[in-house]
Amino acid sequence: ISMTCIQLGLPQTTLWNKRPDWTFDGADEVDPHNNLIKGRGGAMFKEKLLIKSSGKTYIIVDESKLVSKLGSKYPIPVEVFPHALSHVENEIRLLGASKISLRLAEGKDGPVFTENGNFILDIHLSNIVPDLEQKLKAITGVIESGLFIGYDITVLMATR
């Protein structure tokens, strides 16, 4: 999206400078209530900070991202402080996760690191309840999750 803004001559800013008027982003999944799973790229913390800091947020998706239930196509990414990995996995199991996997890097050995130097766990849950985002954040060692439930966003449908 940044490159498109540059091509169109739209000014960009950072949170260091001021509060952005708008944020444009994508999503991995969008349910009928505009709840999202984001974070396949591993930037959940930054994405949530931008949404909370911006005057208005637009999520641009195509129809392949629409799901009747979150978690239908993708697991929930969870950013985890590396030294808390075992503890976080145990706590997430208690929340009913059916599968938890450490995201591994492609093209090199070892895990994916977020831009903050943390690991990403991909978790599968059959039932994503409205307070799951808060329950995940309450686990010591969880930095952020890819669940975006109840955010003030506008979803725009891209067409060809």
Walk through the language-model features, giving the residues of each.
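Conserved phosphate- and dinucleotide-binding cores of soluble alpha/beta proteins
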Residues: I6-R160
